[in-house]
Amino acid sequence: MDPVDLALILALDCSASVSFDEFALMAGGCGAALRDPDVMAGLTGGPLGASLCALLLWSGADAQAVSVEWTRIATPEHLEAFASEVADTPRLVPAGTTAIGAALVACEALLAALPAPARRQVIDMVGDGRSNDGPPPVPARDRLAGAGVTINGLCVLHEEADLLASYTDQVIAGPGAFALECQDFTGFAEAMRRKLQREIAAASRPIIQMS
């Protein structure tokens, strides 16, 4: 497969603090954000004209699932198909604890299985709580950042008002890393749209050495 501008993992929290209605808002919000014209143009408008995207669901230390495998996006039709899969994804992992470190390890494995080189690799960690299970996030975060991967965060504050500080300290890392927040899942789609626009705008700056 030809190289791409961006490899992007959407990693969504499915822990017990996320109700099934909230999960539907989160998945649907991701689908809506992906369909934004600026996001669509960014994913397909880089120097190489394509991106790879995947969806990972996570909760406890032993609960991660790749819900949508790596999908090459080079046309609006490709993106629409991926957005539909994301919006309609079933909740494949149990509503358990919050194991951010284990989720990052799963993202690390997913990036290792990339079907093509990517100029930029980004993980979107989406959650509504601090890590309370499994390995601590920092070792996996540091390994990923050391490999040139950017980990960004989107914090939903309805459970923990100061979650952004925790994500800033323990989760986000890598070139250009940032975290955004939204108050609850009703504002999730707009927050994700802004986040994707910001991430994709950086995709034209290569940070991964391709062989």
Language-model-derived ranges and their functions:
Residues 1-211:
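Acidic, low-complexity intrinsically disordered regions
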